[in-house]
Amino acid sequence: MAGRGIALVLAGLLLGGCVHTQLEPSSESNFTQRDKKLLANAPYAKANIPTAYQRAIVQYHRKEAPGSIVVDTDARYLYYVLPDNRAIRYGVIVGEEALSWYGIAKVGRKEEWPSWTPTADIKRRLDVPNFVEGGAHNPMGARGIYLYQANKDTLFRIHGTNQPEYIGQAISSGCIRMTNEDVIDLFNRVKMGSIVVVLAPRSGDSPSNPQVATAGDPRLN
């Protein structure tokens, strides 16, 4: 179903010359039975995501290989790179500037409905439990994509959320949050070992800017 949706959107791009075309929402055919049950009983209201942050296929102006992930923290977007200078763009929640992480990592682990064990730093700043089981109430949401460097967990993740109303804002403790529907979609696409590039704030290297982003990240060349 997801492949068919992408094919239709790409056809629309070619016929209409469009740069930006909205994708259809995630089909439940991509959800497990557990996904359907937990999302149907989620303890939060369904958010009205602004059009600018809804999933779309867009032109892509960097040189990362298809299958890579690039996060533009300034614009609050995550890109999953496709062939032919295209990418799937998702609206995300990013970390507050003092807490945000940037750099190059790899996907070192993937989990469905992950549990959450807050880091010592988070526990110093926030009144949170020591451990939260996976589920719709969990801040990690429906999926966790764990970022590793040199085979070591960075403690930063791309994951779902139980606060979808904050998509497009910078309020997290450093991790990249997505709607649960979008993180399920990304999780099903991204492979273990895939490159993840999180751009530094104000780097001027946005994937949507063809004037400054054509070279990609030099550390990947």
Q: Where does each model-flagged region fall?
A:
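N-terminal pre-domains immediately preceding structured catalytic cores
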Residues: 5, 10-221
